[in-house]
C-alpha cells in the first residue's frame, strides 16, 4: 500500500478496529456483530467498498461469502496517526503532547512511570 496511509473517518476506523481484532479473514456479518454502533448491512457494504478502494482492505469471495482482510496493520496505522497528531497539533513536540495529556488529566502517576521506563529502555537501546 505504500508508505503513507490515509486518515480514516470514525465510522471507517470502527470497522477497521473490528477487522484488526479478528486476526484473520472476517465476513460482513461478523463485522456487524463486532461493531458497538448499529449499522445496516447496506451501509456496511458501502464502507467496506470504500476501505477497499482506499487500500485498507482486500476482499476475497468464497462461495457466497466475502472475506475481508487488512492490507495495512493496526500498528502501522497507529504510528502514522500518532505522528500526524503530533505534527499537526503539537508542532512535532512530544514534550508539548505529554504536557497536554498531563494537564488534561489523561496521565496518572502509573502511566508517567510506564512512559519513563519506556523512554529509559529506548535510551539504553532496548526495545
Q: Which stretches of residues belong to each language-model region?
A:
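Short alpha-helical segments that sit at the start of domains
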Residues: 1-16, 125
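Short, cationic-aromatic polyanion-contact patches
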Residues: 6-11, 62-81
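Short capping segments at the starts of secondary-structure elements
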Residues: 8, 21-27
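Short acidic, hydrophobic short linear motifs in intrinsically disordered regions
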Residues: 25-35
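Short, hydrophobic-biased segments on the C-terminal half of alpha helices
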Residues: 45-49
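Amphipathic alpha-helical dimerization/coiled-coil segments
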Residues: 80-125
